């Protein structure tokens, strides 16, 4: 997903996939803090913010223990407020259902504690979010079904796309729309 986003000009954070046996020297040059998370979990399971190299190995072990596939994503930390975007696509046409402001515990685990929907965004920012997410859905060739996109918006209004799941959001986001 991240490779597709980068190739298509969608704004993902820099990230590296760590599989069992990967030489961790591939992470040299990444800027701290880092986010370490399993590739295949939801609900913030196994996510850790790492401030320094000495804590990296333990975070990778923790994420791998939470992963079904035993694969871990290490990404550069993205500043900004976190949002999720719920969409439904039918025959390649995307429909924005809601943008949700997310509240979390913050570092180091980022466990969600609450939501506000609709998110208090200007019409201009809402359109910018819609445009970024729809382009990313096209990048992933999503034609039919629900999607749950996660992104961050910094103070300058820049959007970084974290990920897209082919499902509705959890924590009652979909049912409370």
Name every feature range the model reports, one short phrase each:
Residues 1-73, 79, 90-92, 115, ...:
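Active-site nucleotide/adenylate-binding loops and adjacent lid/helix of ATP-dependent enzymes
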